[in-house]
Amino acid sequence: MSLHLSNVILHQLSKNDQEELIVNYRAESLENDTASENLVAELHRVFNSKAGKGFGSFKSDSEFQQSLHEFRAGEQSFYDFSQKSALRLKDELSKYPFADEGTLVLAEYQSLATDYLFIGLLPSNQSLKVTEGLDISATDYLDISKMDIVARLDLSTYDTDKESNRYLTYIKGRVGRKVADFFLDFLQAEVGLDAKQQNQVLMQAVEDFVSDSKLEKEEAISYKKQVADYCNEQLKAGDEVQVRELSGELPASTDGTSFFDYTSEQGYELEDSFPADRATMRKLTKFVGAGGGLNVSFDSLLLGERIFYDPETDTLTIKGTPPNLRDQLTRNKS
């Protein structure tokens, strides 16, 4: 990938004998060599592939934002900025039960004509290696795929549109760890774009458009599949859903109204673009549900053909089961 690295540095967060989190500062920034570029390129790639991201923007009194401004204005060096950030990260992280040790990475770089600032605490893991003497020894490595205490600032958007509610991106982390709360506090930022909510609004707009257009069942299913296919392709490419672009790929209603015009006229509060959510978009073409030991998923076109639902008795009837399921049921019965 095309990546231009401006600055990158590592600091270490570890616990002392009193189990207190401390910072071991690196003496200077890393050289902008091939190894450093490969590290940042991998961080960028893995971050893009992570699901469950949150978006936000700085509060007006954010000390992190002020420190960033001083660095970018040349009033302090990248090294000084990284030290202040590491100390602030340590102080904030110490308030949480998941005060992890790890390697703190700060990187300023450009990818695909967009400037970024990456901040992440990378966990380490152990593996084995074979020495020149063919002995086995333990080695530590950065477990980049497991990183979840991480945020990225889109500097290009931040410079051109400070009113944006999404130039900060962070990984929400596992349930119960409150990583999202931590990063918002650390950066002194507030929640901005809700990507999942945007996907839900899009799905509702599609459902309403199909209903108002009075499409036949097959046409409605085809229309929803086009939307789902577009969103999945955007996900695979690492791109966002562009509402106007999506509308251009969809047929207009019988009176000639495009999907984009429909969402505008009906007052759906959709951003021009937003990240696709696979789980939400999946519901356009499938019925999905789980609970009480039951997990059900089937293509929406099967409803009324092989699968029937009676709301009065809350009964789902399936005609023709998958061969592997039928085999299990038959063997269990005997």
Swiss-Prot record:
Entry's Gene Ontology cellular component terms: bacterial nucleoid; cytoplasm
Classification via InterPro entries: Nucleoid_associated_NdpA
Keyword ATP-binding applies: no
A Pfam family hit: NA37
Superkingdom of origin organism: Bacteria
Keyword Lyase included in the entry's annotation: no
Cellular compartment(s): Cytoplasm, Nucleoid
Name the record gives this protein: Nucleoid-associated protein VS_0951
Alphabetized GO MF terms: double-stranded DNA binding; single-stranded RNA binding
PANTHER family per record: NUCLEOID-ASSOCIATED PROTEIN YEJK, PTHR38772
Main localisation: cytoplasm
Family: Belongs to the YejK family.
Keywords: Cytoplasm
